[in-house]
């Protein structure tokens, strides 16, 4: 499944390690984690899949996150991606969020299925060398004035 997603997500793909972590999270039994994997097959051949992670939250952040949906466009019947998303929505308890690149044609599909554009996501990534320098106990300290 990791390799299938890595190949068929095309230019929108994550690295294999990130895909594997999303799958591990989906299958986790730890509190506040979990999710599920949907597979679309044509005979014995995998032609599509979707990964949902549960967020453990609700309200301000949807309870579920559609992490990945991909199809093998050469082998999957037309509509396989839409069917996977519909099934993911039906199987999820609570609301579902996803991220999609601005130039991804799948935005139209998601809009047709009832998703609306709520936010523009912005990310700040801590430099790797800085992550390694900060001890865990320092990261857990309360902000100044709350001690």
Predicted regions and their residues:
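A short, internal acetyl-CoA/4′-phosphopantetheine-binding micro-motif in the GNAT/acyltransferase core
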Residues: 66-76
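Conserved active-site alpha-helix within GNAT-family acetyltransferase domains
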Residues: 82, 97, 102-124
């Amino acid at each position: 499944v990791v390799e299938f997603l890595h190949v068929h997500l095309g230019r929108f793909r994550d690295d294999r390690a990130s895909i594997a972590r999303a799958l591990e999270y989906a299958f986790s039994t730890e509190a506040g984690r979990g999710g599920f994997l949907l597979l679309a097959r044509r005979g014995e051949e995998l032609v599509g899949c979707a990964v949902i992670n549960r967020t453990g939250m609700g309200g301000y952040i949807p309870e579920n996150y559609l992490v990945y949906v991909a199809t093998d466009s050469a082998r999957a019947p037309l509509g396989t991606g839409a069917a996977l998303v519909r099934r993911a929505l039906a199987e999820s308890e609570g609301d579902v969020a996803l991220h999609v690149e601005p130039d991804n044609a799948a935005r139209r599909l998601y809009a047709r299925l009832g998703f609306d554009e709520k936010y523009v996501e912005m990310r700040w990534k801590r430099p790797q060398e800085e992550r390694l320098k900060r001890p865990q106990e320092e990261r857990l300290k309360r902000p100044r004035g709350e001690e």
